[in-house]
C-alpha cells in the first residue's frame, strides 16, 4: 500500500518546495530507539541527512535505522556527538546526560524531538493527532487512508504501522501526518493545517505542575497553532473536549457516539474481533464502516480518521478500503497467536495500553470478542509517578480481569516511590476482593506460573508500555503454536 504513486518529476518538485535546513549536515539523536525518535530519524535519513544516534540497547528500531545508514552507539559518551550540527532529545533524556552536556559545552544546538518534527512539517500540509489515548492508532489510520487514495503521505508515528512495516515513511506528496506528543507539551512546536484531539485525561502531570487546568489550557494553545483556515477535529464523547470547544477560535468538527456529534456513530456491533457500524455525516449521508480491529474505542479512532479524510476531499471508496484493510498499530491489541499449553489452548495478545482508561477499553474489547472466556492479564505498571497519580483507578480497572499476574514497575528512569509499587497495587486489589493478584518479581518464573493458573480457552493480555511485550514474545517463542 505504501508504494509511491507519484512520478519522479513530481517527487523532485516536492523536494524543491521543501528547503534543506541550512548548515545542518549531521543530526544526532540521544535515545534514538525511543517511541517517535526513530520515526523522525528515518524520515531525515531518507531526505539525505547523515544521522547518528545513541541508545542503551539494541532494538528493531535501531536495527532498521542502521540498515538505512544511521551510525548508532549503544552507550552514552561525549564522543558520540562528534561532527553533529544539532542534537535531538526526547523527554526521557535527562539534562545531565553526558551527550547533552557535551553539546552545550560545544555550543551545538540541543532541541526537543517535536522541534525537529516541526521543521519537517514546516513546508508541508501537516495533520497532527494528539490526545491521551488513541493517537497512535488514529495517526496510522489516517496515513493508510491517504496512501490508499494515492497521496503517498509522509508520516511519523509513535508506533508501528503494520501494513507499512514501519512507523515512518517519506512520501512524495506535500502531506505529513504525525502523532503529536503532549507528554512534555512539546506539541506546541507544531503548526499543522489539521489537528485531531481524541480525548484529554490527566497524565504526565509533572509536565503541567500537577494542574489539570494547565493541561487543558495547553491543549487549547495547541489548537490555536492552527491557521485561521485550519481545522480542529475533536471527539464529542469526551467531556473535557466538550468543555473546551467554545474556547477554540478555529473551525471545529466533532465526531463520536454522542447525538451532538457532527459525524455520529450509530449501531456499533462487534463480532469476534471485527467491528462494524454506521457514520451519519453532517449532510445526512450514511456510511457503513467495517473494521478488523475490535472495540468502540477503535470505532472512535477510525471515525476521527474518516472525518479528516472526508473534510479534505478524499472519497468514501479509499476511506472504507483503508479502514477495512487496517491491520492495527504495533502493540495495539496485537494478536500473537493461539498456543497449546498443558491445560489447553490459549490466545496471547500484546497491548501497549498503560493508563487505566486504555487498560479498561482493552479489557472491554477482549470481553466482547472472547465471550464466555476468562481474561488473564500480565500487567506491568509503567512509571512510579503514573502508578501513584492513578493508583485508585488502576485498582478498579485491574480488578475486572479473571486472572491477574503483576510484574514489577517499569521505572523508565524514575526513582521508586513508596506506596506506588506493584506490591502495593496487589494489596489494594486483593482487598477489593474481586481478583487475587499474583506478584512475580522475576519474570523468568512467568511461564511456570502461567501454566499453573491458565485454563483451556483463556485469553492472555500482556499489558503495559515497558518491556512486558518483549517478555511475552520471548515466552511465546518457547510455546507450541496451534
Swiss-Prot record:
It is found in: Cytoplasm. Keywords: ATP-binding, Cell cycle, Cell division, Cell shape, Cell wall biogenesis/degradation, Cytoplasm, Ligase, Nucleotide-binding, Peptidoglycan synthesis. GO terms for molecular function: ATP binding; UDP-N-acetylmuramate-L-alanine ligase activity. Pathway: Cell wall biogenesis; peptidoglycan biosynthesis. ATP binds at residues 131-137. Signal peptide: none annotated. One of its GO terms (biological process) is regulation of cell shape. One of its GO terms (cellular component) is cytoplasm. Belongs to the MurCDEF family. This is UDP-N-acetylmuramate--L-alanine ligase.
Amino acid at each position: 500500500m505504501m508504494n509511491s504513486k507519484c512520478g519522479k518529476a513530481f517527487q523532485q518538485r516536492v523536494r524543491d518546495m521543501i528547503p534543506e535546513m541550512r548548515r545542518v549536515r549531521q543530526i544526532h539523536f540521544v535515545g534514538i530507539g525511543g517511541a517517535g525518535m526513530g520515526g523522525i530519524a528515518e524520515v531525515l535519513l531518507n531526505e539525505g541527512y547523515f544521522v547518528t544516534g545513541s541508545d542503551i540497547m539494541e532494538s528493531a528500531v535501531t536495527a532498521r535505522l542502521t540498515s538505512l545508514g544511521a551510525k548508532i552507539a549503544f552507550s552514552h559518551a561525549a564522543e558520540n556527538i562528534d561532527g553533529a550540527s544539532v542534537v535531538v532529545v526526547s523527554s526521557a533524556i535527562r539534562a545531565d546526560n553526558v551527550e547533552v552536556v557535551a553539546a552545550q559545552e560545544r555550543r551545538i544546538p540541543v532541541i526537543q524531538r517535536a522541534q525537529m518534527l516541526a521543521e519537517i512539517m514546516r513546508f508541508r500540509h501537516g495533520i497532527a493527532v494528539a490526545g491521551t489515548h488513541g493517537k497512535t492508532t488514529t495517526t496510522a489510520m489516517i496515513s493508510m487512508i491517504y496512501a490508499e487514495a494515492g497521496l503517498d503521505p509522509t508520516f511519523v508515528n509513535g508506533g508501528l504501522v503494520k501494513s507499512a512495516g514501519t512507523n515512518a515513511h517519506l512520501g512524495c506528496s506535500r502531506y505529513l501526518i504525525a502523532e503529536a506528543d503532549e507528554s512534555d507539551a512539546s506539541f506546541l512546536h507544531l503548526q499543522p493545517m489539521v489537528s485531531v484531539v481524541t480525548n484529554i485525561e490527566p497524565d504526565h502531570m509533572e509536565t503541567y505542575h500537577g494542574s489539570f487546568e494547565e493541561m487543558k489550557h495547553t491543549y487549547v494553545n495547541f489548537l490555536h497553532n492552527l491557521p485561521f483556515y485550519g481545522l480542529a477535529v475533536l471527539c464529542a464523547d469526551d467531556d473535557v473536549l466538550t468543555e473546551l470547544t467554545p474556547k477554540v477560535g478555529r473551525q471545529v468538527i466533532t465526531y463520536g457516539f454522542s447525538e451532538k456529534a457532527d459525524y455520529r456513530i450509530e449501531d456499533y456491533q462487534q463480532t469476534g474481533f471485527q467491528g462494524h457500524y454506521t457514520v451519519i455525516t453532517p449532510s445526512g449521508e450514511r456510511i457503513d464502516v467495517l473494521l478488523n480491529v475490535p472495540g468502540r474505542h477503535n470505532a472512535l479512532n477510525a471515525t476521527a480518521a474518516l472525518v479528516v479524510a472526508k473534510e479534505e476531499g478524499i472519497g468514501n471508496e479509499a476511506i472504507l478500503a483503508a479502514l477495512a484493510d487496517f491491520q492495527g498499530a504495533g502493540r495495539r491489541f496485537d494478536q500473537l497467536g493461539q498456543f497449546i499449553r498443558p491445560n489447553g489452548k490459549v490466545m496471547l495478545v500484546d497491548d501497549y495500553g498503560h493508563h487505566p482508561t486504555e487498560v479498561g477499553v482493552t479489557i472491554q474489547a477482549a470481553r466482547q470478542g472472547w465471550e464466555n472466556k476468562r481474561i488473564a492479564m500480565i500487567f506491568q505498571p509503567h512509571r512510579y509517578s503514573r502508578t501513584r497519580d492513578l493508583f485508585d483507578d488502576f485498582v478498579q480497572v485491574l480488578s475486572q480481569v479473571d486472572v491477574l499476574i503483576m510484574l514489577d514497575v517499569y521505572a523508565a528512569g524514575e526513582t521508586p516511590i513508596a506506596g506506588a509499587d506493584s506490591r502495593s497495587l496487589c494489596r489494594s486489589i486483593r482487598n477489593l476482593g474481586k481478583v487475587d493478584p499474583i506478584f512475580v518479581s522475576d519474570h523468568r518464573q512467568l511461564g511456570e506460573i502461567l501454566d499453573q493458573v491458565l485454563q483451556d480457552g483463556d485469553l492472555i493480555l500482556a499489558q503495559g508500555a515497558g518491556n512486558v511485550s518483549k517478555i511475552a514474545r520471548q515466552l511465546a517463542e518457547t510455546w507450541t503454536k496451534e
